[in-house]
Amino acid sequence: MIAIPCMDTMPTLFVSSLVLMDKMPETEMAFAVSSLIYDARNTIAASALRNNFDRLLWIDSDMKFDRDMMKRMAQRMDEGYRFVTGVYCMRKPPYAPVLYKAFEPGIDPMPFSKGELDPGKGMIQIAGCGFGAVMMDVSILSEMKNQRSDYPFSPFLGLGEDLSFCKRATEMGVKLYCDTSIRLGHVGLQEFRL
């Protein structure tokens, strides 16, 4: 399932990427509209569990990506990875990568440097990431539901919903990875890219 949480409108660069994307056979899409992104993510997560999907591809509505992104992430999942993201940056200076070596609630996360994310590095383990483009095994949500009483994307104090999810997942022993060869643009008034 392709999971797209959004607030209201979607930039043309995102829509064109989505339309042109090489989709896997029988792929469904779920849009959840909410002014609270964590609520939209929790709604889609519950639907994925209820409908017995195997994988979720989260794509934020402000991302621009290559048409083969889904297939490349699926290939990594087929290799045994349960959580895969790509490389993109924040939309404001200093345009830091939205990939973290370490983070704790209330403390600024420690991002990877651009040099550490060279496309030739391939797969690297991360502590957390933004959810602009993440493919994950739905079994992670199932395990989380069985081990915790809170919603998977409910934000911890001092963390967004994406890093809060990553914290929950890593506390359960889930390993998170970034494929540094998968590059995305983050769309604002212009496209931002590393």
Regions found by a protein language model. Give the residues of each.
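Residue-level recognition of beta-strand->loop/alpha-helix junctions
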Residues: 30-33, 87, 180
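N-proximal low-complexity "stem/linker" segments adjacent to membrane-targeting elements
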Residues: 1-39
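Catalytic donor-sugar/metal-binding loop of nucleotide-sugar-dependent glycosyltransferases
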Residues: 149-159, 163-186, 191-193
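Short beta-strand-to-loop acidic/aromatic patch adjacent to the donor-nucleotide binding site
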Residues: 53-64
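Anion (oxyanion) recognition and catalysis
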Residues: 23, 78, 170
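Short, Asp-centered acidic motifs that coordinate Mg2+ and/or phosphate
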Residues: 55, 81-83, 176
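Conserved catalytic core of nucleotide-sugar-dependent glycosyltransferases
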Residues: 45, 66-154
